Amino acid sequence: MSKKGKKYIEAFSKVDKNKFYNIEDAILLLKEIKFAKFDETIDISINLNLKKNHTVRDTIVLPNQFMKPKRILVFAKGDRADEARAFGATHVGDDDLINKIKSGWDEFDVVVATPDMMKDVGRLGPILGKRGLMPNPKTQTVTNNLKDAINSLKKGRTEFRANKNGVISFSFGKSSMDNEKIKENYEEFVKEVVKKRPSDLKGAFIDSIYISSTMGPSIKVNFVWR
């Protein structure tokens, strides 16, 4: 474990690690112990009780956006390519973009593809997969409905998923945001995660929830969703 600085230790000392804070108090405390001089991102970590065969994965558009606009790349041909440009995609193409990405170009944040392009896009698996950007029907990034896909991405639609240890890590705000807006994003995100509870799971679905800022310690949050 890396050595923590004096300011982190001071902030850590103000957090009762045995206490479950309600979300309002957790947000207040998070801002009170903030010591970084930049606008920190606020993250949530949800520990789930999952079996090995369970998958928790989906996308969400939070009610209060805080991230910079995403650079949207669309793989499409012909009329579909024209549609993508009309709907505001940042980059649109087919083989030209595939070759460009193979050469090391990476100036994009999210990738969408029409179904007919996936055979060719699949050649980028080692590159896009490593960045978590391979188009997938489950995340609504393999589709012929480019209008809805692009519009929702422009509104901030973002993927979340549980890792192999059953932990979901997700950014849901900025420290400069109004407390109520941070709370709204928190509640919307947890609500969406709860909807992904596996139908055959017995017992509690959520084991624990923590929030933290970029540089700050974790704060355990009380929750009623199980």
Curated annotation (Swiss-Prot):
GO terms for biological process: regulation of translation; translation. Keywords: Repressor, Ribonucleoprotein, Ribosomal protein, RNA-binding, rRNA-binding, Translation regulation, tRNA-binding. InterPro entries: Ribosom_uL1_bac-type (IPR005878), Ribosomal_uL1 (IPR002143), Ribosomal_uL1-like (IPR023674), Ribosomal_uL1/biogenesis (IPR028364), Ribosomal_uL1_3-a/b-sand (IPR016095), Ribosomal_uL1_CS (IPR023673). Disulfide bonds: none annotated. GO terms for molecular function: rRNA binding; structural constituent of ribosome; tRNA binding. CDD domains: Ribosomal_L1 (cd00403). SUPFAM superfamilies: Ribosomal protein L1. GO terms for cellular component: large ribosomal subunit. HAMAP family: Ribosomal_uL1_B. Part of the 50S ribosomal subunit. Binds directly to 23S rRNA. The L1 stalk is quite mobile in the ribosome, and is involved in E site tRNA release. Belongs to the universal ribosomal protein uL1 family. This is Large ribosomal subunit protein uL1. It comes from Borreliella burgdorferi (strain ZS7).
